[in-house]
A protein has these predicted regions:
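Cytosolic juxtamembrane N-terminal segment immediately preceding the first transmembrane helix
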Residues: 1-25, 103-110
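Extracytoplasmic
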Residues: 13-41, 134-138
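C-terminal ends and interior cores of transmembrane alpha-helices
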Residues: 26, 83-112
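Central cavity-lining transmembrane alpha-helices of secondary-active solute carriers
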Residues: 48-69
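Small-residue-rich packing faces within the transmembrane alpha-helices of Major Facilitator Superfamily
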Residues: 59, 79, 86-87
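Intracellular juxtamembrane helix-capping segments at the cytosolic ends
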Residues: 132-146
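Glycine-rich segments within core transmembrane alpha-helices of 12-TM secondary carriers
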Residues: 150-162
Length: 162
């Protein structure tokens, strides 16, 4: 009886962790909108480029994330994704302190400075993180729920935080 209780407690902790990861996915994905407003003041065309870069990463990371789960497992893939996300956020932070006075190329609306390129690179890397986390969370919640209706219910509960 004691083993069953420990197993259920571990399952509850895993479910709560997966729901927390759903909330992190939402945070990182939606972080581009307020930053985009700031970039929109300097470059009228760049307001949604951060979100675009975030979702463009799915194109490049979807299949490798699935392969990573097959080779490394759910836990290691989630931890790698969190490390990648931290690197992406640090790169985005660097865009606020470096490159504002270094023009990279010119458009008809003016010079595009290095800090925008750094920010977009950070958003792209954060998109890798979000893609890997999505690849982990959805099947993991279904697995924790035992598949079928119960697994889908857990995905819906986690999705409310997304």
């Amino acid at each position: 009886m004691e083993q069953k209780s420990v197993n259920n407690n571990g399952r509850v902790i895993a479910i709560i962790t997966m729901c927390f990861i759903f909330a992190m996915i939402s945070f990182v994905t939606n972080m581009g909108a307020p930053f985009g407003n700031i970039w929109g003041f300097k470059y009228s065309w760049a307001a949604m480029m951060g979100n675009f870069m975030n979702f463009a990463a799915y194109l490049f990371m979807g299949i490798p994330a699935g392969k990573m789960i097959e080779s490394k497992g759910y836990k290691k893939t989630a931890l790698i994704a969190l490390a990648v996300g931290t690197i992406g956020l640090m790169i985005q932070y660097l865009s606020s302190i470096f490159g504002d006075d270094i023009p990279v190329f010119n458009l008809s609306s003016g010079a595009v400075c290095l800090n925008l390129i750094i920010y977009l690179l950070g958003a792209f890397i954060c998109g890798f993180c979000v893609c890997m986390l999505n690849t982990v969370v959805n099947p993991m919640l279904n697995l924790l729920g035992g598949g079928g209706n119960r697994g889908n219910q857990l995905i819906q509960i986690g999705g409310t935080l997304n």
